[in-house]
Regions:
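Extracellular/luminal ectodomains and secreted, surface-exposed scaffolds of diverse proteins
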Residues: 415-435, 514, 519-530
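Edge beta-strands of extracellular beta-sandwich domains
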Residues: 461-472, 559-578
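Aromatic-rich peripheral "rim/lid" segments of glycoside hydrolase catalytic domains that contact
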Residues: 315-417, 449, 459, 473-477, ...
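Sec-dependent signal peptide cleavage junction
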Residues: 22-36
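Short, aromatic- and glycine-rich surface loops/edge beta-strands on solvent-exposed regions
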Residues: 445-460, 544-565
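Surface-exposed, short loops/turns at beta-strand junctions within beta-sandwich domains
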Residues: 438-450, 530-548
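Extracellular glycoside hydrolase catalytic/binding regions
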Residues: 38, 75-76, 162-165, 169, ...
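Active-site mouth of glycoside hydrolases
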Residues: 37-225, 230-240
Length: 579
């Protein structure tokens, strides 16, 4: 995973459901427990190993970077202090993605740069010293050169084997808490989502070759845990079935399966109107991990979710609205753990700041940390909008308590002023009602935007924060510019943009991804609250026809504004139209 990961969109938009043709079999001892079914079966040793890795973290965009060194993709040089802090944050395992391509010499030896190997070993040792389980792999090599296996097998396979021969030799005496992953997100063409049966043959050959090389390299590699991916690390049924067959064939009690998950694609990138964590997004989670459990875990093959996150994060972590993002991670973490699958957060530097060693979004971390042990309560929204000039009304919000009890509501995050139940708010079942008098006091400043934060605390799990926002209808203005730098002046008046629709005069969808009128946030358009404008990005105009395009901007308050642009080559003009 890295900044180009959104090229996989077609994979996530249509998950294939097939009926497994495999008969139940256990190759690694007793089946692992499934907490959701109340099973209390004894775990195999390798399942216990994987369970002890929970939770995990990825050192992304560092050794997998394809520049001159580990800093070439913008992250600082890895320090021992960083690794120690990851352990202190509660993580039990670390995945260190590594791209070897430009660190290897020519054939037939394909010698790896000794200085680079030494540096990788140094960070691996720091991680082991910090008490972490460690996973290393071949990372972007998968799409740089390994994907050519079909047409260039005689070069790809020896190079792959040479890489693992050298890696296995270097680490053969390291602790068993170090594991090897054969290849990251393997694919065998230039795109994603291929179902060509020959690709399964190629992956089976790579995994089998990897297994043989490591096992024959001696030392602790004779029984070191090895991690094998599905095709593209995707959890479609056929891909799980194919990996199952490979693992059965290898007949080795120290094998682990791995998949990746970045959510239901429309929600993950904020497209097609999927702005909230709704039932279809939730069902994608349950379907995915039910398949992984039924096909692998229930048959004694442990599974590591080697990467997870949201694809919109590649643009910025605000692509998905904060509360909706938190609900996604709360439920995902809960469900993956319920299926006895270990999860490893993908972090390319956008989550844990590697310079100041602090979380960029503390709420995100606090919710994840709480979810490692229990469920957290959430709400239907974290946004409470009060429209300026209108009479303030009582506001009701449905809570998703997840078995918890509300213990108090406080003004701001320091929990200084506590609201009084009955006077300031009421709770009836799962419905929280904030009194009009309370909201009126909180927005008395008359200033647009965030006026207060209300922190709801519960007997267990993380807090839930509501933003109390004073707003008015946003105002847009006429604009003129070019397709590579067009922006609409906008007075947001405290409101926040949720999504944008685009259609031609005949009603057909305009711009990229024209199967939907709702465009992708951060790809086709983006708001700038600092410069007070909505930018229509070059990606949008690259796939928009000349002529009139009618836009509709949807805001989180419920406000909807119409706007019309006219494109003539590279020239673009825009004007407000009536709602």
């Amino acid at each position: 995973m890295s900044f180009w990961h959104n090229t996989k969109s077609i994979v996530f938009i249509a998950t294939v459901l097939l009926i497994s043709l495999l008969s139940p079999a256990s190759i690694l001892g007793a089946s692992a427990k499934n907490p959701s079914e109340g099973n209390k079966l004894k775990e195999s040793k390798i399942q216990s190993y994987v369970s002890d890795m929970q939770p995990g973290w990825n050192l992304g965009n560092t050794f997998d970077a394809m520049g001159e060194d580990e800093t070439s993709w913008g992250n600082p040089r890895v320090t021992k202090e960083l690794i120690q802090q990851i352990s202190k944050q509660g993580y039990k395992s670390i995945r260190i993605p590594i791209t070897w391509d430009h660190r290897m010499g020519d054939g037939p030896d394909y010698k790896i740069d000794p200085a680079f190997m030494d540096r990788v070993e140094e960070v691996v040792n720091w991680s082991l010293d910090a008490g972490l389980y460690v996973m290393i792999n071949l990372h972007h090599d998968s799409w740089i050169w390994v994907h050519q296996m079909g047409e260039n097998r005689d070069e790809v396979l020896p190079r792959y084997q040479a890489a693992w021969t050298q890696i296995a030799h270097t680490f053969k005496d390291h602790s068993h808490k170090l594991m090897f992953e054969s290849i990251n997100e393997p694919r065998f063409n230039s795109g994603w989502g291929s179902e060509d049966q020959t690709h399964y043959v190629h992956l089976d050959e790579l995994n089998t070759s990897f297994h043989k090389i490591v096992r024959e390299s001696g030392g602790k590699n004779t029984d070191r845990p090895l991690v094998l991916p599905t095709l593209e690390t995707n959890a479609a049924q056929e891909r799980l079935d194919e990996l199952y067959q490979t693992i059965v064939k290898l007949d080795d009690p120290n094998l682990i399966a791995t998949i990746h998950y970045y959510g239901f694609w429309p929600f993950s990138v904020n497209i097609a109107g999927f702005t909230t964590f709704e039932e279809q997004t939730k069902k994608d989670i349950t379907d995915t991990f039910d398949r992984a459990y039924d096909t692998l875990v229930s048959k004694g093959i442990p599974v590591i979710l080697g990467e997870y996150g949201l694809l919109g994060f590649d643009k910025n972590t605000g692509t998905i609205e904060q509360g909706e993002k938190l609900k996604f991670f709360e439920f995902l973490t809960h469900y993956v753990q319920e299926k006895n699958i270990t999860h490893m957060l993908w972090d390319n530097g956008q989550h844990f700041n590697r310079t100041n060693l602090k979380w960029n979004d503390q709420d995100f971390y606090e919710l994840m940390r709480a979810s490692w042990k229990t469920r957290s309560a959430t709400a239907e929204s974290d946004l409470i909008f009060i429209k300026k000039g209108e009479k303030v009304q009582d506001t009701s919000i449905n809570l998703e308590l997840n078995g918890n009890k509300l213990t108090g509501i406080f003004v701001n995050r320091n929990k200084g002023d506590k609201l009084h139940k009955g006077k300031d708010y009421t709770l009836s079942g799962n419905t929280l009602t904030l009194k009009a008098s309370t909201l009126e006091k909180l927005t008395a400043s008359g200033q647009y935007g965030d006026n207060a934060e209300l922190t709801a605390s519960f007997n267990k799990g993380a807090d839930w924060t509501f933003d109390v926002i004073l707003h008015d209808t946003p105002k847009l203005e006429s604009a003129a510019g070019s397709a590579d730098s067009f922006a609409i002046p906008a007075a947001f008046n405290g409101d926040r943009l949720a999504t944008m629709e685009a259609v031609y005069s005949d009603g057909t969808n305009a711009g990229p991804q024209n199967w939907t009128s709702y465009k992708e946030f951060g790809y086709a358009f983006t708001p700038s609250y600092q410069s007070n404008e909505i930018k229509l990005l070059e990606n949008f105009f690259n796939e928009a026809n000349d002529g009139i395009v009618n836009l509709k901007f949807h805001f989180w308050s419920g406000e909807v504004l119409n706007y019309q642009i006219t494109k003539n080559g590279n020239e673009v003009t825009g004007k407000v139209t009536s709602n």
